[in-house]
């Protein structure tokens, strides 16, 4: 069986968004599932709109998602000699010709055709003139006058297109640059691409591409056109639906695996399963399970999926993603056991890493900031004995596991006659500055002996100064 070779060919005219990221993911997963190859190609022939910054952003987005490529990135702007060679092949074989029709004339004929309810295809004025090359000449592909071009699509099935409705289309502009449809075909042929998975907005391009494959005596790739991604109101996905770029999701605290899980469910399914690891996706992905109806992007569902991935994550694996967010807040955080222990206490309490960074603040604040209302309510003289006694008990322990801490809390409860809740809350405020935090036992264990005792002592001093 021939090795599967897929590609992702973004245009660097902006950020990588949900639709493009899903296309990249489907191609990458299929290549990895089949033991094939995945190629990254930057389609930057639109000189006016393409930017280096956008290309770099797309590459960073893919790297963050963990979508790695086996070849590339190739840049179309550096392949002009290849396109020129293939233009000459089509001219020599009679499948293409020079055209000098002015833009004004073409515009006039187009407007007239539309006004008369006709398809505005080229009328063939230059088709049989055998014109020589010139500065103002474009190159057109000679489309058959009759018959149909059939697309056998793995998702949509068979689709037939009347050749007469396609017309002779431009494949090289007068400035010698190739048009999109032509460059794509040449690239896919020369790079050995044999499987093309893309959005179904490309279906109308496909008959033109099939005709060029045949004119160049090249084997057709397998086409799989995936339904578009829509917003919850069933219109084309945009920012007003809450969709952001991939890098914005990174900066907002989403996990790569969380976003990938949500992306793959926009058009692909495996029974009723909602949550997938990356390994599972590679094992399970197939074209047969791509649906025929549009995927609907739901920000709330993405958030829930992300929370599930955070909950199931190894703290050590989350640390590199959380660290930049903590440093952004000005904390001297490092990727060490202290950070891993802090993360462990927050796995069930955080839907995003940004939320986790906010909730982890008390682990790194020095000095600790206190919520005024919490201080006024709990750091009061009648609770000073609780803090002093607990500090004394904790200082003698060999370790701070929950099992080791329980007798210390029990002793304080017995001595003061207060229930656990009445003890835990003043301790929580003393250690975190807040009334909400992870469980008190795990908080103490994560803070460690030195910080726990220092903060209990600081709280006692604060109470003394306030009286």
Curated annotation (Swiss-Prot):
Instruction: Report any one BP term from Gene Ontology.
Output: glutamyl-tRNA aminoacylation
Coiled-coil regions listed in the entry = none
Does the record bear Protease in its keywords? no
Residues annotated to bind Zn(2+): 99, 101, 126, 128
One cellular-component annotation, GO: cytosol
Motif mapping: 'KMSKS' region = 236-240
Keywords from UniProt, A to Z, are: Aminoacyl-tRNA synthetase, ATP-binding, Cytoplasm, Ligase, Metal-binding, Nucleotide-binding, Protein biosynthesis, Zinc
PROSITE patterns from the xrefs? AA_TRNA_LIGASE_I (PS00178)
Return the Gene3D superfamilies for the record: 1.10.10.350, HUPs
Which free-text remark accompanies the cofactor?
Answer: Binds 1 zinc ion per subunit.
Catalyses which reaction(s): tRNA(Glu) + L-glutamate + ATP = L-glutamyl-tRNA(Glu) + AMP + diphosphate
Say yes or no: keyword ATP-binding present.
yes
Subcellular location, record wording = Cytoplasm
EC number(s) in its UniProt entry?
6.1.1.17
Q: Where can the motif 'HIGH' region be found?
A: 10-20
Molecular-function GO terms, alphabetical: ATP binding; glutamate-tRNA ligase activity; tRNA binding; zinc ion binding
Q: Which cofactor does it need?
A: Zn(2+)
UniProt binding sites for ATP: 239
User: Which residues, if any, are the signal sequence?
Assistant: none
Top-level enzyme category: ligase
Which PANTHER family did the record assign? GLUTAMATE--TRNA LIGASE (PTHR43311), GLUTAMATE--TRNA LIGASE, MITOCHONDRIAL-RELATED (PTHR43311:SF2)
The family classification in the record reads: Belongs to the class-I aminoacyl-tRNA synthetase family. Glutamate--tRNA ligase type 1 subfamily.
Q: Cross-referenced HAMAP family, in alphabetical order?
A: Glu_tRNA_synth_type1
Role noted for this protein: Catalyzes the attachment of glutamate to tRNA(Glu) in a two-step reaction: glutamate is first activated by ATP to form Glu-AMP and then transferred to the acceptor end of tRNA(Glu).
Q: Subunit structure, per the record?
A: Monomer.
The identity of this protein, by name, is Glutamate--tRNA ligase
**Organism of derivation:** Desulfosudis oleivorans (strain DSM 6200 / JCM 39069 / Hxd3) (Desulfococcus oleovorans)
What's the name of its gene?
A: gltX
